[in-house]
């Protein structure tokens, strides 16, 4: 049985790598050993290493657990897609377009 390979767009991988680096810097600024953060997050040291590298194969829950272990930084996840300007514009366009009722048979 082979492992499923995660296909990630280059721009997305850049974002994940940057996020992983920021998580690592947050841990280092707090002078927290990797072993302690991994234990607090309930993950292995290897998984923490993958989080800090921005690996796309790591579950979103692991990223959230690590952020929580860094003094409740997981609350920042609430900011993801909060301002969906493009989605709102699409929704507004749909609301402006008049929809006709289906023709009655008879």
Model-derived segments and spans:
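DNA major-groove recognition helix of helix-turn-helix/homeodomain DNA-binding modules
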Residues: 2, 61-79
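A short, Lys/Arg-rich alpha-helix, primarily the initiator
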Residues: 3-29
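Short basic helix-loop element that most often maps to the first helix and adjoining turn
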Residues: 21-37, 97-105
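Short alpha-helical DNA-recognition segment
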Residues: 31-49
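Residues that mark the N-terminal boundary/hinge immediately upstream of a DNA-recognition element
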Residues: 33, 59-62
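Short, charged recognition helix plus adjacent turn
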Residues: 77-106
């Amino acid at each position: 049985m082979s492992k499923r390979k995660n296909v990630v767009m280059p721009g997305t991988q850049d974002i994940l790598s940057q996020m992983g680096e920021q998580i690592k810097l947050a841990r280092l600024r707090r002078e927290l050993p990797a072993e302690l953060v991994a234990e607090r997050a309930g993950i292995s040291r290897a998984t923490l290493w993958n989080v800090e590298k921005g690996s796309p194969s790591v579950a979103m829950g692991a990223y959230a657990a690590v952020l929580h272990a860094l003094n409740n930084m997981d609350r920042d996840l609430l900011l993801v897609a909060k301002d969906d300007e493009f989605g709102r514009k699409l929704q507004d366009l749909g609301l402006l377009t008049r929809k006709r009722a289906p023709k009655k048979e008879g």
